[in-house]
Curated annotation (Swiss-Prot):
It holds the Pfam family Pox_G9-A16. It comes from Vaccinia virus (strain Western Reserve). It comes from the Viruses. GO terms for biological process: fusion of virus membrane with host plasma membrane; symbiont entry into host cell. Interacts with OPG143/A16. Component of the entry fusion complex (EFC) composed of OPG053/F9, OPG076/O3, OPG086/G3, OPG094/G9, OPG095/L1, OPG099/L5, OPG107/H2, OPG143/A16, OPG104/J5, OPG147/A21 and OPG155/A28. Except for OPG095/L1 and OPG053/F9, each of the EFC proteins is required for assembly or stability of the complex. One of its GO terms (cellular component) is virion membrane. Changing residue 2 to A: Complete loss of myristoylation. This is Entry-fusion complex protein OPG094. Belongs to the orthopoxvirus OPG086 family. The gene is OPG094. Unglycosylated because produced in viral factories instead of the classic ER -Golgi route. A lipid is attached at residue 2 (N-myristoyl glycine). The chain crosses the membrane at residues 320-340. Residues 2-319 are virion surface.
Amino acid sequence: MGGGVSVELPKRDPPPGVPTDEMLLNVDKMHDVIAPAKLLEYVHIGPLAKDKEDKVKKRYPEFRLVNTGPGGLSALLRQSYNGTAPNCCRTFNRTHYWKKDGKISDKYEEGAVLESCWPDVHDTGKCDVDLFDWCQGDTFDRNICHQWIGSAFNRSNRTVEGQQSLINLYNKMQTLCSKDASVPICESFLHHLRAHNTEDSKEMIDYILRQQSADFKQKYMRCSYPTRDKLEESLKYAEPRECWDPECSNANVNFLLTRNYNNLGLCNIVRCNTSVNNLQMDKTSSLRLSCGLSNSDRFSTVPVNRAKVVQHNIKHSFDLKLHLISLLSLLVIWILIVAI
């Protein structure tokens, strides 16, 4: 019987291992990937040597370092947001920043520590205390404060904490603005109250404005608090006083009581207003602004009431003398008869 045949196969070394995508990650090149991570989100950072763990923990104190596999594979788990109100609230564009030696930067530099802002920090009311104080100071940004006040009327946060912060803000604004509504933050508050256009907002506007001092009313609210002579004159016309009284047509609408504001809306008044926050021009640039009026008429304070205009024209027209016209007519007729 035949015996079995054995064949010796050639020996080969196993192929080298192929690194996975996770193994190719480098934590030192992932600053912009790690920073935006949400709460309880994992960010894989690849293999991490033991001697680098403390350095990574110091750079990212808001995260917990987690082992994910052999060979030192690791990940960072976000646990908190350490950004401060002054650094996060006084802008609407910042999600995080890097802090080093007491200075902050939007870009990472060696030795800097990450501090992140809470998501939707303005919507949750976490900025109200800081911005309320900052917007009354000397270094505030009017656009930021105006935007913050406006956003308060449209917050989506409906938690107990968020609602209580909003109530506290309204109460503080009402107290502050009742003393002096000319403060920039108060003028913004009145503007957004008017735009909110509810019965409660209208009542708050009128309450705040009625609390103003006599000097304030004399300076800013002469439309809402007219003189006796102006009131008596207004009885002569069917048109609302707000339509022809220059104190109304030229008034700051934020300082009008609701009834005056509504009456002004019934008028047909041409108004021109231009606001430029930032304008950059060079030698080739040109700028032209026009309201469709001549220079002499652009800032006219003549009342716009039509009846008054007609009366004004009649009063200043020449006086017709009928008896002189009659005599002149007879003289012309006599001359014609004699000439014939």
